[in-house]
């Protein structure tokens, strides 16, 4: 029964896309969590419209991720999905993991090497593994993921290249496309880029980075995002959704 539950997250995302239901993930970076405030934070998450919790960061110790996920599983009913920065960020306590391949860059570590390292570990867990084409988009400032991965994001005005990259990911077998402006981005992913990609790929589109208010979430949805990720804005203001 447990395995059946754990293998439904991707299917739920597909069903939501089919039915026009928009999804929302709150991204928690364990490195930025103030543990004394965790209960209050989880209360706010439980009161929010969030449908998923993503956990991860560019540089996070695996033990910290384990501890946070354990707390989340105890105190929320939302699916907990690992958003890994490297192969050490794997915990069997989560429900699923985004199996990321950084398609916007040409660093082989983030295209395939870390995936090779992670595969044998993941095979020993019951985690639902969701293949995800990860595409960094220029956002007006250097973000942590660009710095750590030593890759350049795609030009935010080059819609053709962004679309071709997303389509390549789809053809390679990605189940999701994740358009990422980056944590603390000055500018979100361009709405026209979201629209062009969502109209020309069949798989669900995740959009994150640089979205600072509810209006920004709505605009991303209207452009074609199936799931929006909020991280820094919620970290900075746990009352983000109160308005």
From Swiss-Prot:
Mg(2+) binds at residues 29, 58. NCBIfam families: GGGP, GGGP-family, PRK04169.1-2. The keyword Magnesium applies. GO terms for cellular component: cytoplasm. Belongs to the GGGP/HepGP synthase family. Group II subfamily. GO terms for molecular function: imidazoleglycerol-phosphate synthase activity; magnesium ion binding; phosphoglycerol geranylgeranyltransferase activity. It catalyses: sn-glycerol 1-phosphate + (2E,6E,10E)-geranylgeranyl diphosphate = sn-3-O-(geranylgeranyl)glycerol 1-phosphate + diphosphate. One of its GO terms (biological process) is glycerophospholipid biosynthetic process. Prenyltransferase that catalyzes the transfer of the geranylgeranyl moiety of geranylgeranyl diphosphate (GGPP) to the C3 hydroxyl of sn-glycerol-1-phosphate (G1P). InterPro entries: GGGP/HepGP_synthase_sf, GGGP_HepGP_synthase, GGGP_synth, IGPS_HisA/HisF. The keyword Membrane does not apply. Its EC number is 2.5.1.41. It comes from the Bacteria. Pfam families: PcrB (PF01884). Sn-glycerol 1-phosphate binds at residues 178-184, 209-210, 231-232. Keywords: Lipid biosynthesis, Lipid metabolism, Magnesium, Metal-binding, Phospholipid biosynthesis, Phospholipid metabolism, Transferase. This is Geranylgeranylglyceryl phosphate synthase. Its cofactor is Mg(2+). It is an enzyme of class 2 (transferase). Homodimer.
């Amino acid at each position: 029964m447990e395995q059946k539950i754990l293998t439904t997250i991707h299917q739920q995302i597909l069903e939501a896309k089919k039915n026009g239901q928009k999804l929302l993930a709150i991204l928690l970076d364990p490195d930025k969590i103030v543990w004394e405030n965790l209960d209050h934070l989880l209360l706010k998450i439980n009161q929010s419209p969030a449908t998923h919790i993503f956990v991860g960061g560019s540089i996070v110790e695996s033990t910290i991720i384990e501890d946070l996920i354990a707390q989340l599983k105890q105190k929320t009913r939302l699916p907990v999905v690992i958003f890994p920065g490297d192969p050490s960020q794997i915990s069997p306590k989560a429900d699923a993991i985004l199996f990321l391949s950084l398609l916007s860059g040409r660093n082989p570590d983030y295209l395939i090497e870390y995936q090779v390292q992670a595969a044998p570990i993941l095979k020993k867990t019951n985690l639902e593994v969701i293949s995800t084409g990860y595409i960094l988009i220029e956002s007006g400032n250097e973000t942590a993921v660009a710095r750590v991965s030593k890759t350049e994001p795609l030009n935010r005005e080059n819609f053709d290249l962004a679309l071709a990259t997303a389509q390549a990911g789809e053809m390679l077998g990605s189940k999701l496309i994740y358009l990422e402006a980056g944590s603390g981005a000055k500018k979100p992913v361009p709405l026209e880029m979201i629209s062009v990609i969502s109209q020309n790929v069949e798989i669900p589109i995740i959009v994150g980075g640089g979205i600072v208010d509810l209006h920004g979430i709505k605009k991303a949805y209207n452009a074609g995002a199936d799931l929006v990720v909020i991280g820094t804005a919620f970290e900075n203001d746990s009352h983000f959704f109160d308005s």
